[in-house]
Design a protein with these regions (language model features):
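Short beta->alpha connector loops at strand-helix junctions that form conserved
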Residues: 118, 123-125, 152, 172-173, ...
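N-terminal Rossmann-like NAD(P)+-binding subdomain of aldehyde/semialdehyde dehydrogenases
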Residues: 1-84
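ALDH superfamily catalytic-core signature
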Residues: 176-228
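A glycine-rich helix N-cap at a beta->alpha junction
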Residues: 144-150
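Residue-level signal for inorganic ion chemistry
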Residues: 11, 56, 117, 148, ...
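Conserved small-residue-rich beta-alpha loop and adjacent elements
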Residues: 75-143, 189, 211
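Short gly/ser/thr-rich secondary-structure transition/capping motifs
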Residues: 72-80, 150-153, 216-217
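A structured beta-alpha segment of the ubiquitous adenosine-cofactor-binding alpha/beta core
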Residues: 82-84, 150-167
Length: 228
């Protein structure tokens, strides 16, 4: 028998369900972000919900073609063999997410990981508890537990999860925590993606409209409580 529980068609179906669930629960998401970050609805829409919706629609549109086996050129040393690029999942993926964009930075990596056929656990930040609860409700209502789930908790839960063996770890957050995760991952040679915080420098030269540049820098620096 063929297992269709995690087929490309099933993943696309789940993404469409996720999109519908987000639309249905939009007011609840806004309230959670307001509670955790005091975000205005318009900012929450632009910086969180809109980006997630666009990511889902992109994968729904492109996943079938991205998942296909592709013929690629190879070395003359392998003649007369044929060479193919075959997309395969890593396996079990851990996603640890920050408090500053708690909705968007949880779901966008989830979408990519699920699209590739992985099983995913999200550990959201305990500093955004209302959004964390909404995330758990959304994910649990859409995905089978063996495909994706959310585990809430403080740093001790993150430590417990990091002590387990994973096939891939995705982390967004501080450089300090990133170093800890890199060290943990290295013990099992686990591949990782670390999106770490920085100072967001901006270079301004003499040929610019200084008033316009100043407004743009201030806007970029102070959006989302300066967490961009």
């Amino acid at each position: 028998a063929t297992d269709t529980s995690n087929s490309v068609s099933k993943r696309i179906q789940n993404f469409n369900s996720l999109l519908k669930s987000i639309k249905h629960n939009e007011s609840k998401i806004y309230k959670a972000l307001k509670h955790d970050l005091n975000k205005h609805e318009f900012e929450s829409f632009l910086s969180e919900i809109l980006l997630v919706k666009k990511e889902i629609k992109l994968f729904v549109r492109k996943l079938r073609s991205w998942s296909k086996k592709k013929r690629v050129s190879g070395s003359i040393l392998n003649f007369p063999s044929r060479n193919y690029l075959i997309p395969e999942p890593y396996g079990n993926v851990l996603i640890i997410t920050p408090w500053n964009y708690p909705f968007q930075l949880s779901l966008t990596p989830l979408i990519g990981a699920i699209a590739a056929g992985n099983a995913v656990i999200i550990k959201p930040s305990e500093l955004a508890p209302a959004t964390s609860r909404v995330l758990k409700e959304l994910v649990d209502s859409v995905f089978p537990q063996n495909m994706a789930t959310v585990i809430e908790g403080d740093a001790s839960i993150a430590k417990y999860l990091l002590d387990r063996k994973w096939d891939y770890i995705f982390f967004t957050g501080s450089t300090r925590i990133g170093k800890i995760i890199a060290e943990k991952a290295a013990k099992n040679l686990t591949p990782i993606t670390l999106e770490l915080g920085g100072e967001s420098p901006c270079i301004v030269d003499s040929g610019v409209d200084i008033d316009k540049v100043a407004k743009r820098i201030v806007s970029g620096k102070f959006v989302n409580c300066g967490q961009t």
